[in-house]
């Protein structure tokens, strides 16, 4: 939701206002920064803020997926004609009403694409929860699957059974 609004503002603003192209490239350049570079500062920052739990991981996922989602939404908005917005403005709709009643429903295919890509990425992510979440009681499913592997051996029967069960919700 936040990413679609940001993509709308940046996508429509790039044609009209000069500085929006810089903002767009600044946000999209975040896709080129690997998590391994950001890992240690994020651990320190989340610990200082006291969000080394599920909430902190959710906030980080919102931030990490913003560049890709803004890229997708702003690219999709180039295919939606501005005449739709102009017609809504002539009918007396505000910019906010135009977005929610005209543009947002037209972006349903992109909402589905963003939801699928984000869900797959967060479901399969091991590193972010492993580094950020403190305490043994807070585990995601991929973190719980790490318990089947140890330094001295692996319980393959239980490990592969858990992998199959973890695959079912994604299908």
What are the residue ranges of the model-derived segments?
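A structural signal for multi-pass alpha-helical bundles of membrane permease subunits
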Residues: 1-171
